[in-house]
Amino acid sequence: MVTTNKQIEEGYLKYMDEILKTEIGKDVNVNLVFIDKGEIERLNNQYRNINAPTDVLTFVYGDDDLYAEIFVCEDVIKENAEKFYNTFEKELLTVLIHAALHVAGYDHEYDTTNAKEMFQKQEEYLKKYDVDNN
């Protein structure tokens, strides 16, 4: 079950729950936390040694009883939406799908085979849940 500290369209949480259930096969507790640019830059530096803000960071805990925290920065998502000629809604959906796939165990930084599969799945879910055309 996905919970959040910010009021967002209910569909986003439903989509994340569906992806997690499909990919993992069971319910997962996920805390979706919206934070500012300074805080996400601090976390990115602390955990990835990258001294810059990012759109999303995902942390997964446990093996059998999975729990995850997903930190999202709206300001970076807005910037990326402009940069990639997306609506904010589509960019947010992209980030949340991406994070859900990380929770499900996909990794694009250290495993190139897994990265290809992850980005294919990300595109499939983007088409399925296309917020700009639903």
UniProtKB/Swiss-Prot annotation:
<keyword id="KW-0255">Endonuclease</keyword>
<keyword id="KW-0540">Nuclease</keyword>
<dbReference type="GO" id="GO:0008270">
    <property type="term" value="F:zinc ion binding"/>
</dbReference>
<keyword id="KW-0963">Cytoplasm</keyword>
<keyword id="KW-0862">Zinc</keyword>
<feature type="binding site">
    <location>
        <position position="98"/>
    </location>
    <ligand>
        <name>Zn(2+)</name>
    </ligand>
</feature>
<dbReference type="InterPro" id="IPR002036">
    <property type="entry name" value="YbeY"/>
</dbReference>
<feature type="binding site">
    <location>
        <position position="102"/>
    </location>
    <ligand>
        <name>Zn(2+)</name>
    </ligand>
</feature>
<keyword id="KW-0690">Ribosome biogenesis</keyword>
<dbReference type="GO" id="GO:0005737">
    <property type="term" value="C:cytoplasm"/>
</dbReference>
<dbReference type="GO" id="GO:0006364">
    <property type="term" value="P:rRNA processing"/>
</dbReference>
<keyword id="KW-0378">Hydrolase</keyword>
<comment type="function">
    <text>Single strand-specific metallo-endoribonuclease involved in late-stage 70S ribosome quality control and in maturation of the 3' terminus of the 16S rRNA.</text>
</comment>
<dbReference type="GO" id="GO:0004222">
    <property type="term" value="F:metalloendopeptidase activity"/>
</dbReference>
<keyword id="KW-0479">Metal-binding</keyword>
<comment type="similarity">
    <text>Belongs to the endoribonuclease YbeY family.</text>
</comment>
<dbReference type="GO" id="GO:0004521">
    <property type="term" value="F:RNA endonuclease activity"/>
</dbReference>
<feature type="binding site">
    <location>
        <position position="108"/>
    </location>
    <ligand>
        <name>Zn(2+)</name>
    </ligand>
</feature>
<keyword id="KW-0698">rRNA processing</keyword>
<protein>
    <recommendedName>
        <fullName>Endoribonuclease YbeY</fullName>
        <ecNumber>3.1.-.-</ecNumber>
    </recommendedName>
</protein>
<dbReference type="Pfam" id="PF02130">
    <property type="entry name" value="YbeY"/>
</dbReference>
<dbReference type="InterPro" id="IPR023091">
    <property type="entry name" value="MetalPrtase_cat_dom_sf_prd"/>
</dbReference>
